[in-house]
Amino acid sequence: MSSINGILTRSFAAGALGFSLCAGAVMAEYPERPISVVVSYGAGGATDFQARIVTMMAAKEDKEGKPVYLNGQPIVIVNRPGAGGQVGWNKFVEQAKPDGYELAAYNVPHFIAQSIVFPKKVKYNIDNLEPIANWGADPAVLIVNQDSEFNSVQDFVDYAKANPGKITLSGAGLYVGHHIASLQLDKAAGIETKYVPSSGGVKAMQFVLGGQTMGGFNNLSDAYRNRDRLKILAVADLERNEFLPDVPTFKELGIDVDDSSVNFRGIMALHGTPDPVIEVLADKVPAMFNDKKVMAKMEEGGSPMRVMSRAEVQKMWKERQAYLAELLKDLRKED
């Protein structure tokens, strides 16, 4: 019996060693080919614009020609827009492989709010996705066309109270940050506006610039790049933003719209991706986000950075899940 135990012990030890060596090999070799990142919004929008910047240094090499971040492999952005992100995220969860070569950009509160409001319609939630790292936090801003009669939030609110349901506001989709900001504004100001969802921030911006809607909520970074063609009335955050220092927060105007709609952006993998692969990504991706060239390019584009580690994002996701579940009980309108 003792000889059998000895054989089993040696076999187990050999198996454990083999597993350890395999894990080490994965960490040493991954990635061996380009990585794709799905962006669930259209080309030219804030998420697409920023995703291309924060991943542009993926294949960077040092002066000696050694890979700095992801083994010298590039990241390729794949746009799959539609339904405020639902099309891209649903396809990612249903079709991608959990191997670390197919990743996706996340938007919070968007995907979390949608998983709460549409649990049967969407396939994604915080349980079947794995955060890697966060690169930015983009507040929602209330915008109107340069030719609009509204020069302030007070003008906007006064008109809305005198004309219930007449103001149309565009946004990037249902239960994305823009929609949440719109619902908060209606409740806090005691007004009724009509929210017009679109396929993403680019289309929502076009609605405002083209006069199809009277105003809209959009990303601060998108508004910043179009600031010569817009009036930016207020920012839905707790503090003014350094890129638009003259734009007040709703809070300072006496309207209780907080930072619930701030758009956190980052990269995620599928649940089930091997731990060694997750570890490589969790180590290298935040460093890539913090690259000096990335930071400079993001600042040039008026894109607020907020780099967070995997552990920090895991905590943020759980907190937002709990918070949004409560918030949407009060804000949700019947669809």
How should these model regions be labeled?
Residues 56, 97, 160-161, 213, ...:
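Solvent-exposed alpha-helix faces
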Residues 1-8:
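N-terminal secretory signal peptides that target proteins for export/translocation
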Residues 30, 68, 91-102, 112-203, ...:
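Hinge/capping helix and adjacent helix->loop/strand transition within the periplasmic-binding protein
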Residues 297-316:
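Surface-exposed aromatic
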Residues 137, 221-290, 319-322, 334-335:
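C-terminal lobe and pocket-closing loops
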Residues 28-127, 166, 174, 187-217, ...:
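N-terminal (or domain-start) structured segment
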Residues 11-23:
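Bacterial N-terminal signal peptides
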